[in-house]
Amino acid sequence: MKIAVIGSGISGLSAAYYLSKNHKVDLFEKDNHFGGHSHTLDLNLNNKKISVDIGFIVFNYKTYPNLINFFKDNSIEIEKSNMSFSVSVKDTNFEYCGKGISGMFSNKSNIFNLKFLNMFFDLIKFYKKNNNLTIYDNNLTLGDYLTKEKLSKEFTDYHIIPMVAAIWSMPPYEASQMPLSFFLKFFQNHGLFKLKNRPQWYTVKNRSRTYVNKILNKISGEHYKNYKINLIKRHKENIEIFYGEKNEFFIYDKVVIATHADEALSILEKPTDEEK
C-alpha cells in the first residue's frame, strides 16, 4: 500500500518506520525540521560547540517500554541523564534545588526562612498523600485541588506550579488549570511523588537528532518538510490530502495522522462523532 504519515514527532517517525517494512510510506511535516518536540540546536559557547535538545529530554525503563524497544530495534545509543528541578525567585534570596535534602538546603539561610519551611513541609505532606491516591474528584483542576488542600502560597507558587509549567512547557496559569486526574496519573507513573528511590532517567547519546536522522533514513518513501496539510478527504477507494497555498493534493491508500488531537480534527473533512 501507499501510505502517508502526517507529523514527524516520535509517533509519526515510529509509525513510518514500522510501516516502511512492508509499504511505501511518505512522511509530511509542517515545520522546517523533522522530529516534532525532538529538536537539537548547536550553540557556540566560549568557542566550543555544544548540542542542546530543547524539547525531547528524558525517559526511563519503567514508563517508556515501547520507546526503549524502538531504540533497541534501531541500535540507538542511550546514556544516563540527571533530571533535576530548581527554583530561584527573582529579587529574593528564595532558591533551592529539588535533588535531596542537600539540594533543598543548598542555600543555608533556608533553614531560618519561614516561607521556605512552609513550602518544604507542604511538599513532604503533598507528595506522601498523593503518591498512591486513587480516589479524587475528576472535575477538579490542579489549582482547585491546591486551594482545597489549603497548601501554602510558597508551595503552590514556588514549587508545584513551576514544576508542572516546566514539564509541559506552559505558562503558570495554564498549569493551574490542568485536570487533577491527568496531573496525578502522570506524576504517579513517572515516580515524581517519590521522596527517594526515584527512577533512573536516560537520554539519547549525542542528542535526539541522532535518532531522528537514523529513522528518516529507514523510511521507505519521501520526506516532505514545510508541508502544511490543509484537508484530508476520505473516499471509498482512496484518500486525498491537500497541502500548501495552492491546495494541491496527493492520493494515498491509507493515512496515519500523528499530530496533536486538535490538529488532527481540524484537517479531517467530515469527522465522525467518535472522532470528535
Model-derived regions: residue spans:
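Mobile amphipathic helical/loop "lid" adjacent to a hydrophobic cofactor/ligand pocket
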Residues: Y61-L180, L184-K185
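Helical element adjacent to the flavin cofactor pocket in flavoenzyme catalytic cores
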Residues: F183-F242
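Conserved Rossmann-like nucleotide-cofactor binding loop
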Residues: S11, H33, D262
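General small-molecule cofactor/ligand-binding pocket signal
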Residues: S51, E79, E222-Y224, F250
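N-terminal Rossmann-like FAD-binding beta1-loop-alpha1 element of flavoenzymes
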Residues: K2-L27
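Central helical "cap/lid" subdomain
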Residues: R234, I241-K276
